Design a protein with these regions (language model features):
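Gram-negative outer-membrane beta-barrel transporters
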Residues: 341, 345, 351, 355-357, ...
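Extracytoplasmic beta-strand/coil segments of soluble accessory domains associated
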Residues: 57, 74-117
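Transmembrane beta-barrel wall of Gram-negative outer-membrane proteins
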Residues: 167-169, 174-205, 213-251, 280-285, ...
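Membrane-embedded beta-barrel scaffold of Gram-negative outer-membrane proteins
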Residues: 288-313, 518-520, 542-635, 643-645, ...
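Short acidic/polar hinge/loop motifs at secondary-structure boundaries
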Residues: 115-141
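Solvent-exposed loop segments that connect transmembrane elements
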Residues: 210-216, 254-271, 316-323, 368-426, ...
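N-terminal periplasmic accessory domains that precede
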Residues: 95-100, 113, 134-137, 149-171, ...
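C-terminal beta-signal and adjacent terminal beta-strands/loops
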Residues: 361, 374, 527, 658, ...
Length: 806
């Protein structure tokens, strides 16, 4: 912390010394512009720039993201108030937390759009970002215009449009820990009607951590991809914009170390006997059609999305051979949206449209139980005593005819006496989901200063689950060369479905001032659809096999006495499936958001300030927790009632004739349970979590960035930019009981960029004070003993980027 404070003080003193040297300038032409004015993005549903709307938002330009060394959405979240996407150890995990809501599995809390394509599979959220022109982050429910799973807000990524941006970009990067990056993109406007862009990238790192048991790297990664975009404008009023993006990633994953929950320090390096791995291939393709008519604009967005991945996870996170999950997803999704909005000058502006989507998702997730699990089962089922009893019985019989030592030798020579247990849980799930939404929003200028906003969306989601899984328990008897197996197969094969419908209203008032500032108030409803849990079937099967212990023992006795294989099949009746339906289903999450804010232009546009306060009432909050009894998987549960309130502030400024630019962001979130009771295990007493803080939600988020550009008179260099940035967050509780947490931490970065005209060289450093912190922590009881694990934040890293444009 001392190093961090000294570094910040040095940076501040340096900035003021530079400003003092430039006081000789008689006229300061500094001005902060709305970023909507600098980087234009399509407004398919809105009429005004974001700072003129009644919404809390943050915009990052491509230039800012380059100086901040942004590589994915996790990096973007560091510079947006109250918006957190932590590093959980793999591209697979895309948890987003905002304004007190979020979860690690199932329905996301925010919607993600790339060039107006809504990403349907949560596993596609965490991907490499490149060719970006700008990113918009809208906080607060956006369901009226964007539908389900935008309860916390929306992220819109826009890539460079070849109609507006031309040339060839080559970006090369290299850093410590063998960070390497290469991107090549070409943008060509053939004529006034045709334009295209094509590009490819590679990104990789050797990572920071190693598996102390196997010696393998635990967080190294290689990923590559390409993107093609075609734009056709046959007339001034009609355009077609088609984009296809492909990405592949291959990485070692989940470098979780053993955590001391009291100190928050990681005591031991990762030591899993099965190193986690993640591989993913995905394609996102979309066609946008826009028509500018007389009195209205028409927009059509069609997309197809494909994702195929495989996740291997040591589910006990330890050196023992206990349980491994090998999960694969195959997802195909289509979306279609038609939007109409008026384009007339007048007091009334409206947007209306319809959205539909369908996603096919097939998941295979076999649980493989290892030798240490088998040894535990053998002991719990008293098979070790049975093995000893069989051996002693045979030994006593043979000892009556020969010396005991000779009898022992004869038994071993014949193959000995062995009783083993093996358990398999194959899982196959089909979970298709359909969604349709019809929406309308109107903005009416009551006066020249006061605008009223009202909107409504009807949203319907139909979720289905078809599962085919079983508990396959095998007892293997090997008695002096004679082998027999007792197999009990408990089958679960059923189909369930559920429908969820919702009306999502929005009300707002905006009052404008002469200098472009405004104040606003909104009331909006948020919504996350319900669905079905699939990761908890390992626990369900384990409980089922225990309930069928009499069947298992009867089969074992028959196999032992007949020396033949015996198989018993256990099926479930409708009453069992009805009980299971209630166990795997989770309800929709609903919320009401009340917000008051302002977008202020201060000191003749030297500073832009965006400030808002909000209060959210949440019902049936969706929480991701480990399954109670064994902890082999995670499931979504509903807390009865919760609430969150907070403040979000963003400041942007410019000085010294725009040579100095800076920004500060701060978010405060207080999120707590109002009514929530749960059990630590199936037979444990109920625990009341009322009044406890919602886990994984940082109470504070803080970010800052400052750049100063020196104009040079050198023939080979146009300018030199020196900058620093900081982001921090905390306190973060890691469990519902609020027993252990991550304290507030801050990470400092810096960069120096030399602009040579044709190319730019940027030297950068991340976490230059080498702060120690955890981005994720949890406890697991998979082995029967509770252990605490954590994902550490990345330590110091430095490198350079070379950008060439011609």
């Amino acid at each position: 912390m001392r190093k961090f404070i000294l570094t910040v003080l040095f940076a501040i003193s340096y900035v003021f010394s530079v400003m003092a040297e430039n006081e000789q300038a008689t006229v300061d032409t500094s001005r902060v512009y709305n970023l909507d004015e600098i980087v234009v993005a399509p407004r398919n549903k809105e009429f005004r720039s974001l700072r003129l709307q009644p919404v809390s938002s943050t915009v990052l330009t491509g230039k800012e993201m380059s100086s901040l060394e942004v590589r994915d959405l996790r990096d973007i979240s560091n510079y947006v108030p109250a918006f957190v996407m932590p590093d959980y150890g793999a591209r697979f995990t895309s948890s987003i937390y905002v304004r007190g809501i979020g979860s690690r599995v199932n329905s996301p809390s925010m919607g993600i759009y790339v060039d107006d394509i809504p990403l349907m599979n949560k596993s596609a959220f965490n991907s490499h970002v490149w060719q970006l022109d700008r990113v918009d982050v809208l906080r607060g429910p956006q369901g009226t215009l964007y539908g389900i799973n935008s309860e916390g807000g929306l992220v819109r990524q826009y890539t460079k449009n070849p109609m507006r941006y031309q040339g060839t970009d080559v970006n090369l990067g290299f850093g410590t820990r063998m960070y390497r990056n290469a991107e090549v993109s070409h943008y060509n406007k053939v004529n006034e009607k045709w334009a295209f862009s094509v590009g490819a990238f590679y990104n990789g790192t050797n990572g920071f951590w190693k598996n102390s048991l196997t010696g393998e790297r635990t967080d190294d990664m290689d990923e590559a991809g390409s993107r093609l975009r075609l734009v056709y404008k046959p007339t001034d009023n009609l355009s077609f914009d088609w984009m296809t993006d492909y990405q592949h990633v291959c990485q070692h994953a989940y470098p979780y170390g053993t955590l001391d929950p009291e100190s928050g320090k990681v005591l031991f390096e990762p030591d899993q006997n099965h190193q986690g791995k993640y591989n993913r291939n995905m394609v996102n393709s979309g066609l946008a059609v826009k028509y500018h008519g007389k009195g209205f604009d028409f927009h059509s967005n069609t997309s197809y999305q494909y994702l195929k991945d495989n996740l291997l996870m040591d589910n006990d996170y330890s050196a023992i051979d206990f349980v491994v999950v090998d999960q694969s997803q195959l997802s195909n999704a289509i979306t279609q949206e038609f939007t109409f909005k008026d384009n007339l000058q007048g007091r009334w502006h409206w947007t209306t449209g319809v959205f539909g989507s369908y996603q096919w998702l097939k998941t295979t997730a076999p649980n493989t139980f290892g030798s240490d699990f088998s040894d535990m089962m053998k002991k719990n089922m008293r098979l070790d005593l049975a093995e000893a009893g069989i051996y002693n019985s045979i030994l006593a019989s043979m000892s009556a005819r020969m010396p005991e030592e000779a009898a022992k030798a004869a038994i071993e020579k014949a193959g000995g006496v062995h009783v083993g247990v093996q358990m398999l849980v194959p899982c196959l799930f089909h979970t298709p989901q359909a969604n349709i939404g019809v929406f309308h929003e109107s903005n009416y200028d009551i006066t020249d200063r006061l605008t009223a906003t009202a909107g409504l969306r009807y949203d319907y989601t139909h979720s289905k689950i078809a599962y085919d899984t079983s508990g396959d328990l095998r007892l293997n008897f090997s008695i002096m060369g004679q082998n027999a197996m007792a197999r009990v197969l408990s089958l679960y094969e059923h189909t369930e479905s559920a429908g969820f419908s919702q009306l999502l209203p929005k009300f707002g008032l905006t009052y404008k001032f002469d200098n472009g500032s405004n104040i606003y108030a909104t009331v909006t409803k948020g919504y996350r659809a319900g669905g079905f849990n699939i990761q908890m079937f390992g626990d369900i099967i384990q409980n089922d096999l225990q309930a069928n212990s009499s069947v298992i023992m009867e089969a074992a006795q028959q196999a032992q006495s007949t020396h033949q294989d015996v198989e018993r099949v256990v099926t479930q009746d409708e009453a069992k499936y009805e009980e299971l339906y209630e166990g795997i289903k989770f309800k929709p999450e609903e919320s009401w958001n009340y917000e008051l804010g302002t977008h202020a232009n201060l000191f003749n546009n030297l500073i832009h300030a965006d400030l808002n306060v909000y209060y959210m009432q949440i019902r049936n909050q969706q929480l991701s927790v480990f399954t109670e009894d064994y902890g082999y998987g995670r499931k979504m549960v509903n807390a009865g009632k919760s609430y969150s309130c907070g403040l979000e502030l963003t400041l942007r400024g410019s000085a010294v004739s725009n040579h100095l630019t800076w920004a500060v962001g701060y978010g405060y979130t207080y999120a707590a349970f109002k009514e929530y009771k749960n059990r630590a295990s199936k037979n444990a007493d109920e625990i009341d979590y009322g009044g406890k803080k919602v886990p994984y939600i940082p109470a504070h988020t803080l970010s800052a960035m400052v750049d100063y550009t020196f104009d040079t008179n050198l023939s080979f260099m146009k300018s030199l930019t020196v900058g620093a940035n900081m982001n921090g967050q905390g306190k973060i509780w890691w469990d519902e009981a609020n027993t252990y947490a991550q304290k507030f931490y801050a990470v400092l970065g810096a960069h120096i960029c030399a602009d040579f005209g044709l190319c730019k060289l940027n030297l950068w450093g991340r976490n230059i004070t080498d702060s120690k912190y955890n981005t994720f922590a949890f406890s697991s009881k998979a082995t029967g003993v509770e252990v605490f694990m954590a994902q550490r934040g990345n330590p110091f890293q430095c490198g350079f980027d070379l950008s060439i444009h011609f």
